[in-house]
Design a protein with these regions (language model features):
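Catalytic binding pocket for nucleotide-activated donors in carbohydrate/polymer assembly enzymes
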Residues: 125, 269-347
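Conserved catalytic-core segment of nucleotide-activated headgroup transferases in glycan assembly
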Residues: 17-26, 157-238
């Protein structure tokens, strides 16, 4: 009997956890798998992967004991999102390099290898699995010379079978929404390293939506706020709520299940904007000079990529009076929404093959 490979999988943030979630069962069919989550106080990756009963390694010193007890043949590790630490992913990567095993990095978002803690580790990665050609392009621009495989993001496989119209009807009925209710999902980005930028952005958003509603008579704008899974103060938005019509979606733990109900997605740059593109939901990425712009500069991105191709709309000016027109146009002008959706269909086609299977194959190859 051929001995099964031992694969150690490590994630430290919700995005990578969602990327690898549908891959884990496929790996377990052919290998011995140890899944490890690295958590801050919100336990975000652990909560997503809880059904697999993952080990926790929430301190850098936990890495060595876990690694040596399991003694893996392959390390599959996500690009880290914990800019402020703990830097457990880096410890696992160093250990794998010391032991001479294959290190496969999987990347869920464009250019996040440019965060300092990931930049230090790139030289150890034998292969990087990227969500698309643009992510590959950024790696090549930054001098990565080893193997790159464009696998797609397994988290987006689910959109192929999703009946958006059916789900939308069911959700709107459940929440007692009227025909003229226009629902905006505000996606939070209040992580420990970005919460100050997040408050600037949401304050701007709330003021702008209030101004837009004053001038739109045929639509009732409702806002559903979904804090980031790693937000350590998710009630921060309450101080900005005055004058907004709110839709309470707290009974749904996952934003993914709610997406079809929304008419617009807004917030600082996030994976939810990409999901909106796949579901043909207009999205607004708010990149203010003293908020989102500063976040993007830290990974050397000039703009959020979907904005550049018209698949989402970028807001760059901290001027509520002028930017209300952007929201008014999207809310009131069906031709504007159709143009956005046309670009989304062109640049974000639904996957034709399973990204989960492709990722599993590439990890098993080593």
């Amino acid at each position: 009997m051929v001995k099964k490979k031992k694969i150690l999988v490590v994630v430290d943030a919700p995005g990578p956890a969602e990327f690898i979630e549908s891959v884990v069962p496929l790996l377990k069919e052919k290998a011995e798998v140890l899944l490890v989550t690295v958590n801050t106080s919100t336990n975000a990756p652990y909560n997503i992967l809880r059904k697999f009963d993952p080990l926790r390694a929430d301190r850098e010193k936990d890495a060595r004991q876990i690694y040596e007890l399991f003694n893996p043949d392959i390390l599959a590790i996500a690009t880290s999102s914990l800019v402020l630490g703990p830097y457990v992913n880096n410890e696992f990567t160093r250990l794998a390099h010391e032991h001479g095993i294959k290190i496969i990095c999987f990347q869920d978002f464009w250019a996040n290898h440019r965060w300092p803690m990931n930049w230090q580790m790139m030289k150890y990665w034998d292969k990087v699995l990227t969500p698309d050609k643009l992510a590959e392009k950024f790696l090549l621009e930054d001098g990565y010379e080893k193997k790159i495989e464009v696998t797609g993001n397994p988290n987006f496989d689910r959109f192929v079978k999703l009946n958006k119209a059916k789900e939308r009807r069911w959700l709107r009925k459940k929440f007692n929404l009227a025909e003229n209710d226009f629902v905006i999902l505000y996606v939070g980005r209040g992580t420990p390293q970005s919460w100050e930028y997040e408050e600037i952005t949401f304050d701007f958003f709330a003021k702008t939506i209030r101004l837009a509603q004053e001038e739109i008579e045929d639509k009732n704008i409702l806002v559903a706020v979904r804090p980031h899974p790693r937000d350590e103060n998710p009630v921060r938005y309450g101080k900005f709520f005055k004058g907004l019509r709110l839709l309470d979606t707290g009974s749904f733990p996952s934003s993914d299940d709610l997406l079809p109900i929304f008419d617009l997605v807004a917030g600082m740059q996030s994976t939810n904007h990409i999901e909106a593109c796949y579901l043909r939901i207009p999205a607004v990425c708010i990149v203010l000079p003293k908020a989102g712009r500063l976040v993007m500069e830290k990974i050397s991105l000039a703009d959020f990529p979907p904005n550049l191709i018209g698949a989402s709309v970028g807001i760059y000016s901290h001027n509520e009076e002028s930017e209300k027109e952007t929201f008014k146009k999207i809310i009131s002008d069906s031709k504007c929404r159709a143009e956005i959706q046309k670009a989304q269909k062109k640049y974000f086609p639904l996957p034709k093959t399973s990204a989960a299977k492709k990722v599993a194959e590439e990890i098993l190859k080593g």
